[in-house]
A protein has these predicted regions:
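Loop/turn-rich, solvent-exposed surfaces of beta-rich toroidal or solenoidal domains
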Residues: 18-24, 29, 61-191
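Residue-level signal for well-ordered, solvent-exposed loop/turn and beta-edge residues enriched
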Residues: 40, 179-181, 208
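Repeated scaffold domains used in trafficking and secretory/extracellular systems
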Residues: 6-12, 52-66, 142-151, 192-203
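Blade-level signature of beta-propeller repeat domains, shared across WD40, Kelch, NHL, RCC1
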Residues: 195-218
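Short, acidic, Ser/Thr-enriched surface-loop or helix-capping motifs
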Residues: 36, 176-177, 204
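A generic structural motif
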Residues: 46-49, 189, 216
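Short, flexible helix-coil linker/hinge segments at the edges of structured domains or between repeats
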Residues: 1-4
């Protein structure tokens, strides 16, 4: 798509006992399921392909993958287009040479997630008698998240760190894994420095705490 941080796909592969899951960088971007033993593509599906006109897609993080051990593998794919400016659209630009200044550019730092294209989608890969098939379960075209979403199978919730674009408020957000609906938000701050700048959120070892690094000191 020419809008990511490199010409290839940026989605690190995630593994199940039978499959390797990742997205490509085609147009449209597709989720791929490869056979773990042979490398054969056993299923694929365009993802994040129903965004409003003008938005592009680049997946630059590892997708959430959950295997329920009953024949269904659920994958959560998140759009990162706009998270940094690698200049891939410029034919004279050498995309192999990057710097702090263009990956963490000032527009993104100051303006926040209005610079990030929206899109979060859940796709299920289902094992059938004849192989595998993929289907979209839900999609959210109103969320921009670069915190590397976290899934808790104990609660059935997906946890993230987003910005309300109307108020500028940075928030922790909880989504229902089954439906994709927002079930809870908690305000953090509307100061620009609370932008996580694609630094991944993580959970504490107690299982009851979430942490998302930002660039703000106070």
């Amino acid at each position: 798509t020419g809008g990511g941080l490199a010409w290839g796909g940026g989605c690190s592969p995630s593994l199940t006992p039978e499959l390797v899951m990742f997205t490509d960088n085609a147009d449209p971007v597709k989720l791929l399921a490869l056979d773990m033993k042979t490398g054969e593509i056993v299923a694929s599906l365009p993802v994040l392909d129903d965004l409003p006109e003008g938005y592009q897609v680049a997946v630059e993080n590892s997708a959430i993958v959950y295997d329920d051990s009953e024949g269904t593998v659920s994958t959560i794919v998140c759009n990162w287009f706009g998270a940094g400016n690698a200049g891939l659209a410029d034919p004279n630009n050498d995309s192999s040479i990057q710097s702090y200044a263009n990956i963490y550019d000032q527009n993104w730092l100051m303006k926040g997630n209005c610079m990030i294209a929206p899109g979060v989608e859940r796709v299920d890969t289902i094992k059938t008698d004849s192989g595998y098939e993929m289907k979209s379960i839900w999609s959210r075209n109103d969320l921009s998240d670069t915190s590397i979403l976290k899934l808790s199978t104990a609660t059935g919730y997906i946890y993230g760190y987003v910005q309300d674009l109307e108020s500028g408020m940075w928030q922790y957000i909880i989504l229902d894994f089954a439906t994709g609906e927002t079930v809870f938000t908690m305000d953090v701050s509307n100061k620009y420095g609370y932008n996580n700048m694609a630094i991944g959120m993580y959970a504490g070892n107690s299982g009851n705490a979430l942490y998302c690094p930002t660039g703000y000191l106070e």
